[in-house]
Curated annotation (Swiss-Prot):
Name of the molecule in the record: Small ribosomal subunit protein uS9
The keyword Ribonucleoprotein belongs to this UniProt entry's keyword annotation: yes
HAMAP family from the UniProt entry: Ribosomal_uS9_B (MF_00532_B)
CC annotations in GO: cytosolic small ribosomal subunit
Lineage, highest ranks first: Bacteria, Pseudomonadati, Pseudomonadota, Gammaproteobacteria, Alteromonadales
Amino acid sequence: MADNQYYGTGRRKSSTARVFMKAGNGAITINKRDISEYFGRETARMVVRQPLELVEMLEKFDFNISVVGGGISGQAGAIRHGITRALMVFDETLRGELRKAGFVTRDARKVERKKVGLHKARKKPQFSKR
């Protein structure tokens, strides 16, 4: 069953996605639910499909994805990163094209922690001169 299955791990913010890719007709299953059912927003679905549209393989593979942590945007970004890595395992010649689009690089931005004495990470209490 697992013949010619490709794997990629993607991360974004606090989300982690495990992406399993095998030959098929373009079905994307996320946490045992269809992509249109899992992501209500069209923008999140577009983010997930970006690397596939770039290399024109939207209808060539089926994806079985498990994603944990974070919110909708972070999970979509993690899935995109995982799909990109799985595509590179499948065909290393796609790396240049994917890198040029910016999909290979892990987005290292995370939420900055709240500091003691401040309201948020950087928001300071109101200053009174007198």
